[in-house]
Amino acid sequence: MKIIFAGTPDFAAKHLEIILQSKHEVLSVLTQPDRESGRGKKINLSPVKQTALDNDIHVYQPESLKIEGVFDKLKNTDPDLILVVAYGLLVPKDILELPKFGCVNIHASLLPRWRGASPMEHAIMSGDNNIGISYMLSLIHI
């Protein structure tokens, strides 16, 4: 299966590593743009970007998936599936409809309780006894 992978933090990089060990082909990776962090305001690569570069996979880092040209670049790869794991940007309708088998989102909580950012941290801080990961097919609602 030909996959476009979208993710940014370490949680997402772990998923990318598993896919890279499979028979599937990662066509390209989408990740958040490099940002300054820490006291020295040093530019750090996201864990997903580092994993992609270590495996010679093309990386796109658009500020938004709605920027002109992003759709065409992704369309030209002819993906079977887009896998989104803690990416941090909304995926627009035209991109959701690109892959043959759709777009799957992996979220680090049992939805809907901790939707949004930092779901694992929120579950732990709230003392939740039941935690897990949600897998869902991303659909367009009209």
For the regions a language model picked out, list residue spans one by one.
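One-carbon transfer enzymes
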Residues: M1-I140
